[in-house]
């Protein structure tokens, strides 16, 4: 059996991840699993911790370890970025999602119940390659990655707002109302439209009233037939609050791409430019206000999971 280097974020999901981490730790101890663990306290810790671990890892141990990440997409993204920046060895990643944003985990077949997800990991005997998105940001000469999505504009503003929200009591008692309040705040905080330029293949597309730019990784979708076009691009124009709320409702109950102010494509590579300072986030990680000149492409990375090693009934457990 593999040994595990565990990076746990007990602060994920408003601190609820702490209980999940304790359950996982007890299970690992009770079943004599070989592991060493570290916890994160602030943003950036996961990236720092994995790079320190790799720096001290002997060459002979490269095939011994799996990195087990317990937290949200942001924590997993930090670990992935740290591994790629260290450029030592692509250690397989295992993931137990303890946040409320679990779309990427769902696409990989990872159970929402932490102990069931742990069984899927411990039952694995080999790594499985999954497709992620690599981006190169030319303004800052940075290379990064995203597992789920990269957002510019109002959607990033909304994600940043929720990470700092103070009405946690309202979110637990009346989630829909908390969501509406956050959406309205983010809408009015993102007052100005911005210009976005896309190059898909040899064609350029120009948008002068962009309000949301969202880039989504769709490579793992079980019903996705266009495997040669796994990057989903959505641009939403700036509209009044009433039309915007229609867009929000349509996202939940219908197909927003049919709205005249929503522009949608799928592609396998992309160049997108936003030459104004806009709020940006990647996999729920806040990047703050930045200029974006992005070149995107697919890469493969090894994940340590056997999704089919548990029953469908177990995989549906919360």
Protein language model features and the residues they cover:
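ATP/NTP phosphate-donor binding region
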Residues: 1-67, 77, 312, 318
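Catalytic core of DAGKc-family lipid kinases
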Residues: 87-209
């Amino acid at each position: 059996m593999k040994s595990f280097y565990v990076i746990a974020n007990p602060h994920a999901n408003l601190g609820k991840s702490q209980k999940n981490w304790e359950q996982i730790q007890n299970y690992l101890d009770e079943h004599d699993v070989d592991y060493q663990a570290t916890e994160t306290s602030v943003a950036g810790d996961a990236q720092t911790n994995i790079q320190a671990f790799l720096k001290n890892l002997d060459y002979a141990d490269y095939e011994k370890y799996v990195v087990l990440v317990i937290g949200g997409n942001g924590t997993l993204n930090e670990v992935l970025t740290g591994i790629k920046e260290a450029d030592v060895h692509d250690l397989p990643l295992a993931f137990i999602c303890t946040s409320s944003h679990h779309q990427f985990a769902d696409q990989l077949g990872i159970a929402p119940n932490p102990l069931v997800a742990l069984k899927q990991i411990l039952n694995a005997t080999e790594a499985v390659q999954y497709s992620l998105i690599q981006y190169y940001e030319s303004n800052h000469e940075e290379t990064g990655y995203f597992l789920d999505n990269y957002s510019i504009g109002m959607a990033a503003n909304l994600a940043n707002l929720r990470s700092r929200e103070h009405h946690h009591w309202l979110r637990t008692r009346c989630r829909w109302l908390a969501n509406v309040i956050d959406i309205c705040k983010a809408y009015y905080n993102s007052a100005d439209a911005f210009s976005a330029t896309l190059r898909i293949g040899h064609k350029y597309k120009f948008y002068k009233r962009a309000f949301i730019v969202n880039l989504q990784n769709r490579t793992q979708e079980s019903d996705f037939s266009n495997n040669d076009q796994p990057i989903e691009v959505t641009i939403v124009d700036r509209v009044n609050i009433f039309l915007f709320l229609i867009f929000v409702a349509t996202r939940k109950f219908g197909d927003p791409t049919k709205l005249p102010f929503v522009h949608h494509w799928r592609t396998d590579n992309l160049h997108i430019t936003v030459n104004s300072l806009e709020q940006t986030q990647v996999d729920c990680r806040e990047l703050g206000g930045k200029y974006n000149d992005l070149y995107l492409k697919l890469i493969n990375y090894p994940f340590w999971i056997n999704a089919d090693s548990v029953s469908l009934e177990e995989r549906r457990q919360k």
